UniProtKB/Swiss-Prot annotation:
Underlying gene: amt2
Compartments, record wording: Membrane
One Gene Ontology term from the biological process aspect of the record: methylammonium transmembrane transport
Taxonomic lineage of the native organism: Eukaryota, Fungi, Dikarya, Ascomycota, Taphrinomycotina
Protein family membership: Belongs to the ammonia transporter channel (TC 1.A.11.2) family.
Official protein name in the record: Ammonium transporter 2
Length: 512
């Protein structure tokens, strides 16, 4: 264990070192492993815990991909998976390039965004991290990179069934730079304004959850509704994918929240406990509410949505509240997000994956309730917030102003996120070849066929025999008819089920 103690200057989970950057093990340069064993400055148990939590967070990205793909129609499944995985790659590059430095460089003192001191991960090898003096900065940087990647995976689901992939990749890089990194700096950088004000946000209620929710809302507004959204009731094509995605998300979330204690300690254990309780209760409340007041059915989709909402709400408060409070937070969140989806339907907002209703609303609720339920003894479980350094807590600890701080923080994050994201999307859509939305014909045949040319599901009985259909000048398959035994194109766009398939054109009409 390092002999240097961390002293919190605010009540976030990020701790600031008592030593200046030049007094770190490497003298602020990152260190030279050829001259000295830099591992000796750090506790192996704490470092191992964060290294283990990093791949746990990574598995959340395919979890999001499966969750979204199951909610979509079959002809748009693969595009949603590709958006999540391509977004993961763009996030890694951006985070390495300058994202980490803009969010966490401690020499940038504006309070709103960092500088380029750690451009391309320079000077990050073995310095004390902004998260804790117990782990090296390189470990911290990689762990935090997972948070950026997960946020992008959540946000990109807003393009479901009508968004183009290419423009989204460019938007991802820009959005991380001008939206995510500044918000992360506000709350997790020791120089950030929200950090200094004493806002409680344990693992990303603002940057990750509210950030992805309001960004998705802006994307939904810019894209507009899907064609036939009003006339048709779209149904998820694979409930099994939704359950699989939920399972991967829940599994990864334990590392996401547990690792945010930045050490192998009791606070990490409490964060995992609270995460499980909030997710479980929210899932139960959601499905029971639907059964009693709406459908009289035990909805699998409803259960999975409730679980995810509870996990989202636990993100900002898992390291600040007691298990009893987590039960209440899970129940409140399950009801609020359930009502939010119903309200979205009445307003005819086509947020196909319910990103705002689940992540935006649950992130808002969880972060706000931190100001009510946060208690000093939970934060003290990491061994840092003890004695004179203990937090003041929330209303239960008679710290009345904390709710106001939490509300101001959420409103600032939501407003900044929505406005800047909308501006990015609006400008991008006006650039030639970077239009956000696919053509109406492409939307009809499916984003998988238009943007990828591959299919998530391709059955033997639905063989694609190209001699029975042709590409129109618009670049989409034309429907054919049989006249006197001869196949003739009609000039109409083939419906998804008629792009098929059999060697006998008379069998056209099967559905995908």
């Amino acid at each position: 264990m390092s002999s240097v103690n961390s002293i919190p200057t605010a009540t976030s989970t990020v701790y600031i070192s008592v030593l200046p950057a030049t007094a770190t093990p490497s003298g602020g340069s990152g260190g030279n492993v050829l001259h000295e064993d830099l591992n000796k400055f750090y506790d192996y148990g704490n470092t191992s815990w964060i290294l283990a939590c990093t791949p746990l967070c990574l598995i959340m990205v395919p979890g999001v991909a499966f969750f979204y793909s199951g909610l979509a129609r079959r002809k748009n499944t693969l595009a949603l998976i590709m958006l999540s995985m391509l977004g993961l790659c763009v996030s890694f590059f951006q985070w390495y390039f300058w994202g980490y430095s803009l969010a966490f460089s401690q020499t940038g003192t504006s309070g709103y965004i960092g500088n380029l001191r750690h451009f391309a991960f320079i000077r990050t090898l073995a310095d004390y991290s902004p998260g804790s003096n117990n782990i090296p900065e390189l470990v911290f940087a990689n762990f935090q990179g997972m948070f950026a990647a997960i946020t992008v995976a959540l946000f990109t689901g807003a393009a479901a069934e009508r968004g183009r992939i290419g423009p989204m990749l460019i938007i991802t890089f820009v959005w991380l730079t001008v939206v995510y990194c500044p918000i992360a700096c506000w709350i997790w950088n020791p120089n950030g304004w929200a950090f200094k004000f004493g806002v409680y946000d344990f693992a990303g209620g603002g940057p990750v959850e509210v950030g992805s929710g309001f960004a998705a809302l802006a994307y939904t507004v810019c894209l507009g509704r899907r064609s036939k959204f009003v006339e048709e009731q779209f149904r998820p094509h694979s409930v099994l994918n939704v359950v699989l995605g939920t399972s991967l998300l829940w599994f990864g979330w334990l590392g996401f929240n547990g690792g945010s204690a930045y050490g192998s300690n009791l606070r990490a254990a409490m964060a995992i406990t609270n995460t499980n309780l909030a997710g479980a209760v929210a899932g139960l409340v959601w499905v029971i509410y639907d059964y009693i007041f709406r459908t009289r059915k035990w909805s699998t989709i409803g259960f999975c949505s409730g679980v995810v909402a509870g996990l989202v709400a636990a993100t900002p408060c898992a390291g600040f509240v007691s298990p009893h409070a987590s039960l209440a937070i899970g129940a409140i969140t399950g009801l609020c997000c359930n009502w939010a989806i119903k309200l979205k339907s009445h307003m005819r907002i086509d947020d196909a994956m319910d990103i705002f209703a689940i992540h935006g609303v649950a992130g808002f609720v969880g972060t706000f309730l931190n100001g009510l339920f946060a208690v000093d003894y939970i934060a003290a479980m990491d061994g840092i917030y003890v004695g004179e350094n203990k937090i003041r807590g929330g209303w239960f600890d008679h710290h009345w102003r904390q709710l106001g701080l939490q509300m101001a923080y959420i409103c600032a994050v939501g407003a900044y996120d929505f406005v800047v994201t909308f501006i990015i999307l609006f400008i991008t859509d006006k650039i030639p070849y970077l239009q956000l939305r696919v053509s109406p014909d492409a939307e009809e045949i499916g984003v998988d066929a238009d943007q990828i040319g591959e299919y998530a599901f391709d059955y033997i009985e639905e063989r694609r025999e190209y001699k029975h259909w042709k590409i129109s000048p618009a670049g989409v398959p034309e429907e054919i008819i049989i006249s006197n035994g001869v196949a003739q194109p009609t000039g109409n766009v083939a419906a998804p089920g008629k792009i098929l398939e059999s060697t006998n054109p008379l069998e056209l009409g099967l559905t995908i």
